[in-house]
Amino acid sequence: MEHKFVFIALAGALGTLARYSLAGFVQQFNSSFFPFGTLVVNITGCFAAGFLWTLFESRWAVSGEVRTFVLVGFMGAFTTFSAFILETGMLVRSTEWIYGIVNLLLQNSLGFGALMAGIVLGRLI
């Protein structure tokens, strides 16, 4: 069991480096304040998570450990947004689409609310 944590941590380190590299590469071509690098990372991560999940489910015979390494470790560190969208997609795919919509609404509204609360609290301190 302990080796699983080491592999997830290693995959997470690789995902973090990939995120930093891609976001920085994209952002260097952008002169505005809009975070295009993060946008590209998040959308790329969502695409990759869906693509790999589908291949793992239907085309490639990979172990649970490999799935965890790639989807939880690498993709989780590359962008947690991809994990959120993947989980929402799994809900919709399993015919729990109401929960998928609720997840979308809650994650976005509560996430933004928490961000704003953090900003307000940070300004008060």
From Swiss-Prot:
Sites where the protein binds Na(+): G76, T79
UniProt keyword list: Cell inner membrane, Cell membrane, Ion channel, Ion transport, Membrane, Metal-binding, Sodium, Transmembrane, Transmembrane helix, Transport
MF annotations from Gene Ontology: fluoride channel activity; metal ion binding
Cellular-component GO terms for this entry: plasma membrane
Transmembrane segments: 5-25, 33-53, 69-89, 101-121
Topology in the lipid bilayer: Multi-pass membrane protein
Compartment annotation: Cell inner membrane
Function: Fluoride-specific ion channel. Important for reducing fluoride concentration in the cell, thus reducing its toxicity.
Family annotation (HAMAP family): FluC
PANTHER family, sorted: FLUORIDE EXPORT PROTEIN 1-RELATED
UniProt similarity note: Belongs to the fluoride channel Fluc/FEX (TC 1.A.43) family.
UniProt name for this protein: Fluoride-specific ion channel FluC
GN (gene name): fluC
